[in-house]
Design a protein with these regions (language model features):
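Catalytic toxin/effector domains delivered as secreted proteins or via bacterial secretion systems
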Residues: 178-181
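Pol beta-like nucleotidyltransferase catalytic core
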Residues: 5-150, 155-174, 185, 189-315, ...
């Protein structure tokens, strides 16, 4: 509260009036000459009541996965493994047998990631797994014996690239870590040619038969009151120059993310690392970029806006570095992020009319430490896990495949007769940011 001094004379009143008038004129000049201070009414509303307030989630937090607020349709689309991962259901008992998993033809291309985690030694892919009754092989000669064949769509050249033999009870699972925009590495394919081939899907979405997201949010079994986040230390250790970092090596994208960054930089400082920027730092899968830990915010901008497509850019470059992620990607964006990330742990570009309005909100947070600290309250209730295998983090791909063989229904034969209905750019992706419409 501001208290006014006691005024004893008319002279003091005049002096106070002059001072207030001068301050008003100076403030007006600043607001009209510095574009970073040209606060719009819409931005002001955003600042007063920011979306995704943590308080809105307190009463709905529980330990059974309902905090995601999945729709009945979404819940029905989950496999048994999906219900374990996303609804926190107890898994069934492991089956009393050993399964052989063949990674067809291109297993070696991801060996360093899933079997070494980009380290200098082999790791057991089932070391952290709830089940261990599986064997993984790259030997294509095992195609006739394998219980499951994993087929990497990204590397597949055409439909003739499939195994030549197949047992009736064998499960073929198509696998991809890319969005539908970049499903195939070798140009466009006729998706209809693959109809009727695959029994299971293996990708990052919740509705996959074998969900393999880049990371996951897990509700803690009990509220963590003992280890609160040291916000004061965090604030002290962050960069006092540029508050935001971004890193990119793929300089092309269909969602115009780099155009958005260019516009954002007109209103707030952003340090740009990687081949698309001017600053150098390792950090492309194999080597980490420790410099990112010096920033308050990280632009976790994906290369396409597709359903649930949230990569290591967010899980590792932001959350693992204790930076607040500013997100662009998943579509429909607000629902995707709200169901997959801790509440009030991120800032969504779709909540702002333009990069300028986003910048104003970030300036506001930088000047309001109490509001900035609210973006870390989720840590008492949730934890985030990196599960992608980059930067020597655990890879759960083969573990999830083994869990699916143990948990999912093996008695009912499932077949994807319409692959495009499950996986297509037209159905599962959205248009990117438009500079004309977005500002």
């Amino acid at each position: 509260m501001i208290t006014m001094p006691h005024l004893k004379s008319g002279k003091n009143v005049k002096l106070l009036f002059v001072a207030v008038l001068a301050l008003t004129i100076l403030t007006t000049l600043l607001l009209t000459t510095d574009p970073r201070c040209a606060l719009t009414s819409q931005t002001a509303d955003t600042i007063i009541t920011p979306t995704g307030s943590f308080d809105n989630y307190r009463l709905s937090m529980n330990r059974n996965g309902n905090w995601r607020h999945l729709s009945p349709t979404q819940t029905a689309s989950l496999s048994r493994l999906g219900r374990v991962l996303y609804l926190d259901e107890d898994p069934p008992a492991a089956r009393n047998r050993t399964f052989l998993i063949l990674v067809w033809k291109y297993g070696y291309t991801t060996h360093d990631r899933h079997m070494k985690q980009y380290s200098d030694k082999e790791v057991d892919p089932f070391a952290r797994c709830a089940v261990k009754n599986c064997v993984v092989t790259y030997e294509d000669a095992a195609a006739a014996r394998a219980d499951m064949v994993i087929l990497h769509l990204h590397r597949t050249e055409n439909v003739e690239d499939m195994p030549p033999v197949r047992r009736p009870e064998q499960i073929w699972a198509f696998s991809t870590d890319e969005s539908p925009t970049h499903t195939f590495l070798n140009g466009q394919h006729n998706f209809n040619a693959y109809n009727g081939l695959f029994n299971w899907s293996m990708h990052y979405r919740m509705d996959s038969d074998i969900p393999v997201p880049y990371g996951r949010t897990v509700a803690k079994r009990r509220i963590d009151n003992d280890r609160s986040f040291d916000f004061s230390a965090w604030l002290t250790n962050r960069s006092n120059t540029s508050p935001i970092a971004v890193m990119g090596s793929n300089c092309g994208s269909q969602n115009h993310r780099w155009e958005y960054v260019a516009e954002l930089r007109k209103w707030i400082d952003v340090d740009f690392y990687g081949g698309c920027g001017t600053l150098e730092c390792p950090g492309h899968f194999t080597k980490d970029c420790p410099k990112l830990a010096a920033y308050r915010f990280y632009l976790a901008f994906e290369n396409s806006n597709c359903d649930e497509y949230i990569t290591e850019k967010l899980w590792w470059n932001a959350y693992a570095k204790d930076a607040i992620p500013i997100v662009m990607g998943g579509a429909p964006s607000r629902r995707n992020y709200a169901q997959l990330l801790p509440p009030h742990s991120y800032i969504n570009v779709d909540d702002f009319a333009s990069p300028r309005d986003l910048a104003f909100y970030l300036h506001y947070l930088l000047d309001a430490p109490d509001r900035l600290a609210e973006y870390f309250q989720w840590r008492r209730y949730f934890e985030v896990r990196n599960e992608h295998g980059y930067f020597q983090t655990p890879s759960y791909h083969y573990c999830r495949a083994c869990e699916a063989l143990n948990y999912n229904d093996l008695t009912t034969k499932k077949t994807y007769t319409d692959l495009l209905g499950h996986w297509s750019e037209q159905t599962h992706c959205a248009a990117g940011w438009d500079m004309v419409q977005g500002d």
